[in-house]
Amino acid sequence: MTRPAFATRRRTQLFDAVVALFLAEGFAHLTLDEIAARLRCSKSTLYTLAASKEQLVQAATVHFFRAATDAVEARVDAVAGARERIVEYLAAVGAALDPASDQFMADLDAFAPAREIYERNTRIAAGRVQELIAEGVAAGDFRDVHAAFAADLVAA
């Protein structure tokens, strides 16, 4: 394995571990020293991911949503039929968010940069539901409806 491939894999593993820790316990109460100790790595290793705790939280939040999006879309791609795809999409989104503890969600809401990432991804998810509805209309599976309105109803 080449050095860049190893570095990329190791970086992904570290982000996965940071995300798992944050999802389980939140992040506001953790210091970089505590994060490093919990992950059994050095603080300098964490600094290869981000220059500060705040930037680490932001980067981990982005990493989480990228991985969640990939997992959700893989599940949707495996299903045929407009209704089934929408149901699978919503179930997959729920499954992706299931590991998020109440503390993580509270910390996310309290930290504006991470909250903005969450809100942006929520808007993207609502747009994806609109796309799935529009695909169903185009395929004749649904009546022609205002997709944005229908997506808002589904998301509520």
Where do the model's predicted regions map?
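Hydrophobic alpha-helical bundle segments that form small-molecule/ligand-binding pockets
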Residues: D77-A80, T122-V154
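Helix-turn-helix/winged-helix DNA-binding modules
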Residues: A24-F27, T48, F142
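Basic, helix-initiating cap at the start of DNA-binding domains
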Residues: M1-E25, H29-R38, E54-Q58
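Short secondary-structure transition hinges
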Residues: A91-E131
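Alpha-helical DNA-contacting segments of helix-turn-helix folds
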Residues: A50, Q55-F64
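Short hydrophobic/aromatic patch on the recognition helix
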Residues: L39-A50
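Hydrophobic alpha-helical connector segments
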Residues: A59, D70-P99, A151-V154
